[in-house]
A protein has these predicted regions:
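Glycine-rich phosphate/diphosphate-binding loops that line cofactor/substrate pockets in enzymes
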Residues: 1, 25-28, 88-98
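Glycine-rich, flexible N-terminal cofactor/catalytic loop recognition
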Residues: 1-66
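Short, basic, glycine/proline-bearing loop/turn elements
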Residues: 1-10, 74-76, 151-155
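Residue-level preference for the first positions of well-ordered beta-strands
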Residues: 4-7, 97-101
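Short glycine-rich anion-binding loops that position phosphate/pyrophosphate groups of nucleotides
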Residues: 12-15, 38-39, 71-73, 105-109
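Charged helix-capping and loop-helix junction motifs
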Residues: 48-49, 82-85, 114-116, 120
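Glycine-rich, highly charged phosphate/nucleotide-binding loops
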Residues: 79-91
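Class I SAM-dependent methyltransferase SAM-binding "motif I" and its flanking Rossmann-like core
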Residues: 106-157
Length: 157
């Protein structure tokens, strides 16, 4: 039986803003994946999303780590190639029956690199779940004591 890929939002940077659901999934998954500068585990441990999760869920450091090379570039060919490579790595691990928590800075529904890998994993017939988090624009408004929208006002994201 295949594992499940959980694309997990780690929020805007404060480990205390990691959701209870995200923490539970990180605890239950034997494998943690992160988008990194390279496939070296040391690069994966330097990712902000990994550091947030490790601060909130200390057992994160004892899990198998997949550092998925996701370069910050607009070079389409390079992006497509690295997305395919990441998807292959994920699918191979998921087909071993292991669940994976792919950590994402911010929220998985807003400019998340896991979107591309999740699509390929779904197309391979493997289950994917997206775990939402606290978006940075909401986290920024809270300490200011500001409402982002009231009454008949519109809020556009």
């Amino acid at each position: 039986m295949n594992g499940t890929l959980y694309c997990v939002s780690t929020g805007p940077g404060d480990p205390e803003l990691l959701t209870l659901k995200a923490a539970r999934i990180i605890r239950q998954c034997p494998v943690i994946a992160v988008s990194a500068r390279s496939t070296a585990a040391s690069d994966g441990r330097q990712c902000i999303a990994y550091k947030i999760a490790a601060a909130a869920v200390p057992e994160t450091g004892q899990k198998e780590l997949l550092a998925l090379h996701m370069p910050m570039t607009r070079e389409r060919e390079l992006l497509e190639r690295t997305h395919r490579e990441a998807a292959r790595t994920l699918i191979e691990t998921l087909r071993q029956g292991k669940d994976i928590a792919w950590l994402n800075l911010g929220d998985v529904s807003i400019y998340s690199s896991s979107t591309y890998g999740a699509k390929a994993v779904r197309e391979a017939g493997v289950a994917v779940e997206m775990v939402s988090g606290v978006p940075s624009f909401c986290a920024a408004a809270a300490p200011l004591g500001r409402s982002l929208a009231e009454g008949g006002e519109e809020l556009q994201v």
